[in-house]
Amino acid sequence: MVKYSQEPGNPTKSAKAMGRDLRVHFKNTRETAFALRKLPLTKAKRYLEDVIAHKQAIPFRRYCGGVGRTAQAKSRHSNGQGRWPVKSARFILDLLKNAESNADVKGLDVDNLYVSHIQVNQAQKQRRRTYRAHGRINPYMSSPCHIELILSEKEEPVKKEADNIVAARKQ
């Protein structure tokens, strides 16, 4: 059994998916995942497809050193720094589709799902080497990551009773 960092509040109304040791940049994937937090599933999938087509940008908030500015990122409530991490978007889109099919098998309403939890962790770095001048060798590392996400059904809030009924009961 794979351990998730957070268990859903209602496991019967949730679907999970996880990817381990994925060969995709950690920093780009973290920013992509943060942009999807609390989005409905249909909007999240459409947003990632737009990122792949370069129609919408992912705003870079934490790992934004040297990242250029674009109007597409400014419209997503950031300072304007953003990119289009296509590979990260494809990996997360595949995981969203996996979690959606898991929800379908569980019998959940797919149109009512939203991304309740998404997290990206660093995986163990993979080492390669590059040869430099004067016989030196430098490391050539990759930064893979683990991605976990949970889709949950929106909880319908309990409707408040009308005031006139409450007043009638008090008398």
UniProtKB/Swiss-Prot annotation:
One of this protein's Pfam families, by short name? Ribosomal_L22
Which organism does this record belong to? Zea mays
Which HAMAP family does the record cross-reference, listed alphabetically? Answer: Ribosomal_uL22_A (MF_01331_A)
Secretion signal, residue range per the UniProt entry: none
Tell me the GO BP annotations in alphabetical order. Answer: cytoplasmic translation
* Any one GO molecular function term: structural constituent of ribosome
Q: Return the protein name.
A: Large ribosomal subunit protein uL22
Q: Mind telling me which GO cellular component terms the entry cites?
A: cytosolic large ribosomal subunit
Q: Which family does it belong to?
A: Belongs to the universal ribosomal protein uL22 family.
Instruction: Write out the entry's keywords from A to Z.
Output: Ribonucleoprotein, Ribosomal protein
PANTHER family under this entry? Answer: 60S RIBOSOMAL PROTEIN L17, LARGE RIBOSOMAL SUBUNIT PROTEIN UL22
Q: Which InterPro entries match?
A: Ribosomal_uL22, Ribosomal_uL22_CS, Ribosomal_uL22_euk/arc, Ribosomal_uL22_sf
Q: Which residues form a coiled coil?
A: none
